[in-house]
Amino acid sequence: MQFFTLSSVDSESWLCDWKNGHDRALAHTQYEKYVIEEAIPFIKHKTGWFGQMMATGCSMGGYHSFNIFLQHPDVFGKVIALSGVYDARFFVGEYGNDELIYRNSPSDNIWNQNDGWFIDHYRNADIIVCTGLGPWEQDGLPSFYSLKKAFEEKNIPAWFDVWGDDVAHDWPWWRIQMPYFLDKLNL
């Protein structure tokens, strides 16, 4: 197993308070395009691996890994998302009918994803989404439970794992969770 870690552009996208919501989503979409059109081909060339990959991350990385998996399940056959917030409103507030923000708000758009191609890919993937209930995890809980409910209603097998009240939104826990879930995937 080999990991490639990519820097984010969150300070220019979702966390850029001086931009409006649409422009934040646009910056994120440009980043997604970079990942799919430049980083992934580079990784495939570098490794000689041309099969599906795994997306994974913690906190904002949890959001990114899950969102890019939902957008590109042909590229990513596995996802481990830890402690993410999966609702774009957390970053931009109410967004009305902005299609670009909606597309990048997993806890919203999954409910209307009925395309058989996507659903079949999701059903054949290894999907793990984990959260704790301890300090700093509360912001992500509503979107975590919304995703869980949507996946259940769409009969998409996924492991939505909730850890205890002592499990904080912090690196010491992610260092425990990541090896645990990798082991569960036999990786």
Located regions from the model:
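Non-catalytic cap/lid and distal C-terminal segments of serine-dependent acyl enzymes
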Residues: 1-187
